[in-house]
Amino acid sequence: MSESGHSQPGLYGIERRRRWKEPGSGGPQNLSGPGGRERDYIAPWERERRDASEETSTSVMQKTPIILSKPPAERSKQPPPPTAPAAPPAPAPLEKPIVLMKPREEGKGPVAVTGASTPEGTAPPPPAAPAPPKGEKEGQRPTQPVYQIQNRGMGTAAPAAMDPVVGQAKLLPPERMKHSIKLVDDQMNWCDSAIEYLLDQTDVLVVGVLGLQGTGKSMVMSLLSANTPEEDQRTYVFRAQSAEMKERGGNQTSGIDFFITQERIVFLDTQPILSPSILDHLINNDRKLPPEYNLPHTYVEMQSLQIAAFLFTVCHVVIVVQDWFTDLSLYRFLQTAEMVKPSTPSPSHESSSSSGSDEGTEYYPHLVFLQNKARREDFCPRKLRQMHLMIDQLMAHSHLRYKGTLSMLQCNVFPGLPPDFLDSEVNLFLVPFMDSEAESENPPRAGPGSSPLFSLLPGYRGHPSFQSLVSKLRSQVMSMARPQLSHTILTEKNWFHYAARIWDGVRKSSALAEYSRLLA
């Protein structure tokens, strides 16, 4: 500044003047006033300092609002970006695992929970898109156990890859047996081939047969199971005794034969009890006996007792076939077999301890006496009453169910007899000769002096036809009650394993061993 008070151009530039003029409120500034120049000179520096401090303070204060003010500005200018922020979906996965765990227990509801978890109104649509597939997966979850069960039953293939033909084959009935197979061979060993024909169902009836040699056990079992009298005996499921075998005096069946029908009825045909042909085979062929038996006839009797005791334990019905009335040794044998019969296995838990005496829990089958090859006079009512009375007296002390389950009077075999004709009716059934049908169909012709009318009448038989009696016997046997063999309900396969265990126990029975020592 010069002495005259004029400002030098170098010191006061255009910017200085602008900076001095800018803060003014308006109008020219008075520079000639007292103290005006000091204000003009000092105030600008202070103003610069103040401006610098204000600029720094405003810059610091403006940085934070600028950063915070940018998102609202962008949100106002660009509405689509609300969906763009990827930061909000980040917490969503943290909540989704919690939401996904709940539908597994509650079933439905993942869509509603995800919709409620979104705070904004526009946000639910985006998560709603992935929610449906998750809901579908959760909806399929309850059906997974069904597919697992099908996989176990149908194989290892996936449910979608299952062949419908295979599933339909499972519903078909089992293969029909065409002939009997061995359950116990001639060496008295158990055979496991019969289990292939058994199912896992409990509605099964087991019928066994006992009888002396040549009484027609195999023929009766074949007629009851699958064959008819008109068929050739060589095609029977249980092979009957051939003419050559009859001439030699031998037995056709050895061990125990097994056959099951489509109606799930098991038939067990056995070798003859107390058979002389088996005894002759042991003696003449020098067959070695087990060490516990010293004499051949003792071994034959023990074999017969083992088979009878086995049938009394695993059968619902046991048919005793005889071809004449009657053999007292047969009834003595039945009482002995009942004595050595193995007891019913007790349950694992002692819940049946309050059932009463041991006789109440012990199992005994139905016993049917079948008089095969009956003659005409055997069908006489007076003779019929005598037979019933004698059997009742011989079996009076037996626990076997030998009465009250089969009746010839109720099936109309004797239409003229009242139901109370027999005082004590036992399970007795009469079947005539099978060959008598051919004789009755071809009666002898009348002589030349007789009336031709008699030649047209059928011959008198004195009893119903063979086919009719076999049909009545079959219907009564198959309609018998099926008591529980053990303390638990057995399926067909369970019965097979139960029978195998019983047979092993019979072979090792201490009661039979003690009885064999008494016979020796």
From Swiss-Prot:
Which InterPro entries does the UniProt record give?
Answer: P-loop_NTPase, SMG9
In Gene Ontology terms, what is one molecular function of this protein? Answer: identical protein binding
* Low complexity compositional bias, start-end: 342-357
User: Which keywords does UniProt give here?
Assistant: Acetylation, Intellectual disability, Nonsense-mediated mRNA decay, Phosphoprotein
Chain positions found as Phosphoserine: S2, S4, S7, S32, S53, S451
Report the PTM annotation: Phosphorylated by SMG1.
Instruction: State the residue spans of region: Disordered.
Output: 1-94, 108-143, 341-360
Q: Name one GO biological process term.
A: in utero embryonic development
Q: Does the keyword rRNA-binding apply?
A: no
Connected disease:
Heart and brain malformation syndrome: An autosomal recessive syndrome characterized by multiple congenital anomalies such as cardiac defects, brain malformations, including cerebellar vermis hypoplasia, hypoplastic corpus callosum and Dandy-Walker malformation, profoundly delayed psychomotor development, microphthalmia, and facial dysmorphism.
Family per similarity comment: Belongs to the SMG9 family.
| Subunit composition and interactions | Self-associates to form homodimers and forms heterodimers with SMG8; these assembly forms may represent SMG1C intermediate forms. Component of the SMG1C complex composed of SMG1, SMG8 and SMG9. Interacts with DHX34; the interaction is RNA-independent.
Q: What is this protein called?
A: Nonsense-mediated mRNA decay factor SMG9
